């Protein structure tokens, strides 16, 4: 029986499951929104919010320059950075191909953005079934993520009504 065993297994062993969640978390932090299955999104939300909470609990210490911090605050910040870094990789690649320091993004950008917010940093939007295997898909994003920059919608030109075809007469 699996009483009091939280979390999903995803049909994987522990190391594969952990690697999958590490990569999903790194991609969510790098791109600020990703599309994945419902179950993975729900599990990813637990992991990502815990990492962001570690940074936000530092307050201003998380995004203040190192030189301005007291030795005690430097130690607190270093400890939090190492806790976050023990779970996610240091570097990620953004859509434009630039390298992103993921830990710095959590400690500086996200902690400043969510300062004073008691959790609930992500939103899961259901997208419907995936074509092919009918898996339920979701979009997981940070709640104040910038909107998706779509191409401006162009008004469709009205199509001229086609003349009705005249029935061909058969000679006979």
UniProtKB/Swiss-Prot annotation:
<comment type="subunit">
    <text>Part of the 50S ribosomal subunit. Contacts protein L32.</text>
</comment>
<protein>
    <recommendedName>
        <fullName>Large ribosomal subunit protein bL17</fullName>
    </recommendedName>
</protein>
<dbReference type="InterPro" id="IPR036373">
    <property type="entry name" value="Ribosomal_bL17_sf"/>
</dbReference>
<comment type="similarity">
    <text>Belongs to the bacterial ribosomal protein bL17 family.</text>
</comment>
<dbReference type="GO" id="GO:0015934">
    <property type="term" value="C:large ribosomal subunit"/>
</dbReference>
<keyword id="KW-0687">Ribonucleoprotein</keyword>
<feature type="region of interest" description="Disordered">
    <location>
        <begin position="153"/>
        <end position="172"/>
    </location>
</feature>
<dbReference type="Pfam" id="PF01196">
    <property type="entry name" value="Ribosomal_L17"/>
</dbReference>
<dbReference type="InterPro" id="IPR000456">
    <property type="entry name" value="Ribosomal_bL17"/>
</dbReference>
<dbReference type="GO" id="GO:0003735">
    <property type="term" value="F:structural constituent of ribosome"/>
</dbReference>
<dbReference type="GO" id="GO:0006412">
    <property type="term" value="P:translation"/>
</dbReference>
<keyword id="KW-0689">Ribosomal protein</keyword>
């Amino acid at each position: 029986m699996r009483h009091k065993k939280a979390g999903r297994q995803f049909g994987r062993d522990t190391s594969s499951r952990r690697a999958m969640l590490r990569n999903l978390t790194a991609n969510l932090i790098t791109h600020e929104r990703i599309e994945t299955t419902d179950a993975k999104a729900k599990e990813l939300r637990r992991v990502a919010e815990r990492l962001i909470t570690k940074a936000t609990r530092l307050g201003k210490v998380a995004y203040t320059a190192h030189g301005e911090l007291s030795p005690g605050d430097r130690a607190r910040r270093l400890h939090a950075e190492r806790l976050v870094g023990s779970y996610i990789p240091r570097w990620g690649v953004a859509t434009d191909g630039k390298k992103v320091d993921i830990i710095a993004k959590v400690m500086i950008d996200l902690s400043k953005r969510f300062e004073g917010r008691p959790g609930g940093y992500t939103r899961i939007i259901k997208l419907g079934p995936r074509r092919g295997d009918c898996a339920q898909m979701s979009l997981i994003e940070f709640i104040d993520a910038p909107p998706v920059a779509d191409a401006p919608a162009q008004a469709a030109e009205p199509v001229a009504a086609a003349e009705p075809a005249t029935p061909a007469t058969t000679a006979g």
